[in-house]
Regions:
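RNA-contacting regions in translation and RNA-metabolism proteins
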Residues: 1-43, 52-76
Length: 76
């Protein structure tokens, strides 16, 4: 899952070397913290949060397939 988030984020940003994903694992839930360069934050969030919502939907669908829950938090 972490690799999926990194791949999507690196495809969107101008500074792919500054993309960082941290995984916090629980029993049934995983929280992924996505950090990008401040200049790329708008690209990852998107207009009215649409890109961020799409990333969260993809990750949630992939996690559901593994009978888990996953949340993506975009950090500054």
């Amino acid at each position: 899952m972490k690799e999926l988030i990194e791949y999507i984020a690196k495809s969107l940003v101008d500074n792919p070397d500054r993309v960082q994903v941290t995984e916090l694992q629980g029993e049934k839930t995983a929280i992924y913290e996505l950090r990008v360069h401040p200049d790329d934050l708008g690209k990852v969030i998107g207009k009215q949060g649409r890109t961020a919502r799409a990333i969260r939907t993809l990750v949630s669908a992939a996690a559901t397939k593994q009978n888990k829950r996953a949340m993506v938090e975009i950090m500054e």
